[in-house]
């Protein structure tokens, strides 16, 4: 596999992860993007058919990633085995995901925050954990939308009404809002997800 250029804010693959590309005919980033998008469309169809409700667990989080990227990457659905430019040490990922799911249940039961705020916190935390080798932003956005619809009974977020996997103003604002959330300021992310 060739070296691909990554958009600003994307997590580069290490050589072992890059070797997990199942489609060896892919030579450009645009080809990779097309194949991944096709796989994500299949995952969306699977979600529409299955209407999952038991989603706050490691098994579902991993299954969703596998459905989104499993036709393209060998490691799809497997937690990362290397440290990245974001997220804690790779060996802490399973416990971090479990803690996130437990915390999300607690946030729901406490009813101290509006459902959108709970979903924003969930999304930010999942992105911060960065559980997979790649595809974390797309996975976290889709996982948050499933959380909104299946658990919180709210409509999906609009995510700036743009394709956030592509460079541009919306992606820049999204990443800036995530950085603000890192500092415990969720206002920009709350605004962004419903624009």
Please state what every model-predicted region is.
Residues 1-195:
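FIC/Doc superfamily catalytic core
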């Amino acid at each position: 596999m060739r070296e691909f250029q990554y958009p600003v804010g994307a997590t580069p693959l290490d050589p072992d992860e890059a070797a997990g590309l199942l489609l060896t005919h892919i030579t450009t980033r645009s080809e990779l993007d097309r194949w991944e998008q096709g796989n994500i469309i299949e995952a969306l169809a699977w979600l529409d058919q299955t209407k999952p409700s038991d989603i706050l667990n490691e098994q579902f989080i991993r299954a969703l990633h596998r459905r989104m990227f499993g036709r393209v990457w060998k490691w799809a659905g497997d937690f990362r085995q290397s440290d990245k430019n974001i997220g804690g040490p790779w060996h802490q990922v399973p416990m971090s995901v479990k803690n996130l799911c437990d915390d999300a249940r607690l946030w729901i039961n406490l009813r101290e925050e509006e459902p959108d705020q709970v979903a924003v916190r969930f999304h930010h935390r999942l992105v911060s954990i960065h559980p997979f080798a790649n595809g974390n932003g797309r996975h976290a956005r889709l996982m948050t939308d499933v959380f909104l619809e299946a658990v919180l009974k709210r409509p999906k977020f609009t995510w700036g009404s743009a394709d956030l996997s592509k460079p541009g103003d919306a992606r820049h604002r999204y990443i800036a809002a995530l950085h603000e959330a890192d500092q415990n300021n969720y206002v920009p992310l709350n605004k962004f997800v419903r624009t």
